[in-house]
Structure formats: structure tokens, C-alpha cells
């Protein structure tokens, strides 16, 4: 019983530590553009049947006398995708998504492969070659792939539908996608998300 009590207390401390880790991460990213905060749920371990082993005063069969729990465990760490605040800037390349959806970008993984990722962070800029990139230098995707704009253009506008107009000429449209079920997208760091098997993309 004493060991069981210690174990139950230990599970509570582990659960509380995970909750504090999640809160600390949310606070550290309070000013991160496009960041979605996380929360953690808790649940009890499955209850075990408690049995009184027969002794001289009991009948031959062991007797069930109730159930007991062995403490608490982390149930799920989940992301809150509700709309965050939107701040205006003077840059025509600073964008924000109102409602659901993600910008599509490409990046390079540890194997050197080009992979697709998704982000809510719309703080974009142009490289010296005119590619539209995010704050990490990953290329933003349009309907035709990488978006390239004349870096010397005098007038760049992006309307509410994601259509990019450069000096009066439509160049491309941002590839903005959404997913039927957010349980199939995972955070990968640097404010990016990836999809897992089963994800259904919508546009």
C-alpha cells in the first residue's frame, strides 16, 4: 500500500510537470506570429479490481471488494486553433489569415529533401532573387509553385483572396489550404506544421 501511494503521488507530479511545460512554452511564444497555444488534458489510469485473498474466515473463492486507481496520466496535448489577434503593419508582404486555413511553404528536411509544410505566420519578405519567403527563408507557395516577384517592383498588393498583383499585373495566387480534421496535422517547430497519414486537404 505504501509503494502504491508513492507511485500514485509520482504520477501526479509527472502530470503536473507536463502541464507546466506546456504553459511555459505558451508564454515563451506569446509574441510569436501565428503561434497557436497548446493545452493538456489529464485522465486517470484504468481502475483495477481489488480482491481479498481467501483466508480461514472466508469461503474457498477469493472475493472482490471494489476497485482502485493507480493515479493520473497525461491524456492529450492539443492545440487551440481559435482566431488570434491581428496587428496591422506598413509592409504589403505582412499577411494574416482571418479564420481557418494555412499558408503553404516548402522547406528542406534533415535528409536534404524538399518537403511541404504549413504555417499561420504571414510575415513574408522578398529575397534578392525575388522569391517570396517566410521569416525562416522557406519559399511561400502559390498556385504555380514558388512565388517570384521582381524585387524592384514599385507596387505589390495582395488582396483578400490571396491574389498577388505586381505593378498592375496579376502574378500568382497564394496557395492557402485547410484540413477537414486538425488531428492529422502536427507541429514541427519554427511555427510550421506537417500532415500525417489520413489528412484530407481542402482549399
What are these regions (language model features)?
Residues 1-203:
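Amphipathic alpha-helical polymerization modules
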Amino acid at each position: 500500500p505504501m509503494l502504491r501511494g508513492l507511485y500514485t503521488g509520482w504520477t501526479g507530479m509527472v502530470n503536473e510537470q507536463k502541464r507546466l511545460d506546456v504553459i511555459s512554452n505558451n508564454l515563451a511564444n506569446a509574441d510569436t506570429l501565428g503561434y497557436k497555444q497548446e493545452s493538456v488534458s489529464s485522465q486517470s489510469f484504468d481502475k483495477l479490481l481489488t480482491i481479498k485473498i481467501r483466508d480461514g474466515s472466508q469461503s474457498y473463492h477469493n472475493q472482490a471488494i471494489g476497485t482502485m486507481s493507480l493515479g493520473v496520466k497525461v491524456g492529450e496535448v492539443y492545440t487551440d486553433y481559435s482566431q488570434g489577434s491581428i496587428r496591422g503593419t506598413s509592409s504589403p508582404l505582412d499577411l494574416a489569415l482571418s479564420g481557418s486555413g494555412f499558408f503553404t511553404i516548402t522547406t528542406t528536411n534533415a535528409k536534404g529533401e524538399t518537403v511541404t509544410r504549413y504555417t499561420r505566420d504571414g510575415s513574408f519578405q522578398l529575397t534578392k532573387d525575388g522569391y517570396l519567403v517566410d521569416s525562416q527563408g522557406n519559399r511561400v507557395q502559390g498556385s504555380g509553385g514558388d512565388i517570384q516577384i521582381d524585387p524592384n517592383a514599385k507596387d505589390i498588393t495582395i488582396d483578400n483572396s490571396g491574389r498577388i498583383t505586381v505593378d498592375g499585373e496579376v502574378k500568382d495566387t497564394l496557395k492557402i489550404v485547410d484540413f477537414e480534421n486538425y488531428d492529422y496535422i502536427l507541429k514541427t517547430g519554427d511555427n510550421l506544421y506537417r500532415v500525417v497519414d489520413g489528412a484530407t486537404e481542402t482549399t
